[in-house]
């Protein structure tokens, strides 16, 4: 069943669901064994407190650094408030799952206890080097007579810092391809005049784009994980990414890509060329694929079910102690 709730869009941030009184009898009537809270804020906190009173186990998932987004936009007061609020929410739940070691540390440093790592899976059948399309690559190279194709995949929003790619867009031998859509697209089209914007892609079409190009570059500094990087690695496409956040769990520096300060334009340019012209690039591409081959969705989901079981047993033990 799906229950719709109202939401609020805070300035420049993603919409957030709001509590609704009708949820309490709905949850009590449904009587779940465990409640999974994805990126809980207002609605999630409300449900977590309901669950606590009803002795229903809760698992919260930390997957969006909303406080970091606020800081990026210069909303210092909002950043500090959201940081404390997020910690308070996750401290209300029985277990918090975070997608990267960085995200786990971030929560623990904020005072959240009982945090465990739960990464993301990747579709290894769809995202594979076999999806490389030489004709697609040649089509993009023809626009400017470039030598290499660089791809960015992700939401086109200010916090993703896609404009940091301007130094790459200015190089005549590099063709930048932007895959995605978002509120910053119009501005980015002006700031990256040589880039090719192909819009939102998914499924096999997305895999074909990621697998066909020479290097994937990601510039967002508030990623708790970054699924786009993982999908790129699965395609055997090496990555240049930020040396902070979730990407540090995914990119093996010097082996499957490079971790750098992507805001340093000269370092970014040097790093991209370093990868493109690396004598062992073919070995790095093989290593990229190998690095994620164990992360099937079956394996990841099985680990989630184990977390559910652990929490259910833990709360049951707590009930027995109280009784």
Q: What are the residue ranges of the model-derived segments?
A:
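Conserved acidic donor-binding segment of nucleotide-sugar-dependent glycosyltransferases
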Residues: 252-254, 258-264, 274-279
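A short, well-ordered alpha-helix in the C-terminal region of glycosyltransferases
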Residues: 280-294
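Short hydrophobic beta-strand element within catalytic cores of glycosyltransferases
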Residues: 238-241
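Donor nucleotide-sugar binding/catalytic pocket of nucleotide-sugar-dependent glycosyltransferases
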Residues: 84-133, 138, 145
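Nucleotide-sugar donor phosphate/pyrophosphate-binding loop at the beta->alpha transition
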Residues: 57, 68-88, 98
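Aromatic "clamp/platform" in nucleotide-sugar-dependent glycosyltransferases that forms part
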Residues: 221
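Nucleotide-activated donor-binding/catalytic signature segment of Leloir-type glycosyltransferases, i.e.
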Residues: 185-204
């Amino acid at each position: 069943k799906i229950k719709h709730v109202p939401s609020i869009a805070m300035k420049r941030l993603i919409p957030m669901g709001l509590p609704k009184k009708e949820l309490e009898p709905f949850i009590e009537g449904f009587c779940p064994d465990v409640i999974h809270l994805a990126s809980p804020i207002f609605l999630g906190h409300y449900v977590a407190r309901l669950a606590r009173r009803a002795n229903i186990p809760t698992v919260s998932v930390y997957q969006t650094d909303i406080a970091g987004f606020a800081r990026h936009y210069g909303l210092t007061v909002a950043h500090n408030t959201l940081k404390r609020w997020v910690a308070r929410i996750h401290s209300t739940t029985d277990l918090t799952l975070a997608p990267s070691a960085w995200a786990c540390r971030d929560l623990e440093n904020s005072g959240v206890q009982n945090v465990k790592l739960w990464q993301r899976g990747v579709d290894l059948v769809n995202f594979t080097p076999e999806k490389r399309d030489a004709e697609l690559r040649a089509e993009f190279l023809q626009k400017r007579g470039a030598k290499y194709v660089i791809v960015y995949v992700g939401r086109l929003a200010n916090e993703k810092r896609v404009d940091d790619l301007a130094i790459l867009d200015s190089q005549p031998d590099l063709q930048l391809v932007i895959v995605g859509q978002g509120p910053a697209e119009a501005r980015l089209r002006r700031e990256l005049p040589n880039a090719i914007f192909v819009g939102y892609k998914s499924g096999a079409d997305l895999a074909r784009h990621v697998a066909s190009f020479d290097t994937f570059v990601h510039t967002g500094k508030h990623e708790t994980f970054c699924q786009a990087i993982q999908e790129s690695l699965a395609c055997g496409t090496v990555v240049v990414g930020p040396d902070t956040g979730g990407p540090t769990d995914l990119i093996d520096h010097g082996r499957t890509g490079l971790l750098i300060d992507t805001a340093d334009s000269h370092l970014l340019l040097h790093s991209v060329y370093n990868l493109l012209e690396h004598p062992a690039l073919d070995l790095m591409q093989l290593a990229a694929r190998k690095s994620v081959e164990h992360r099937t969705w079956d394996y990841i989901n099985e680990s989630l079910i184990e977390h559910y079981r652990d929490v259910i047993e833990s709360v049951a033990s707590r009930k027995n102690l109280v009784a």
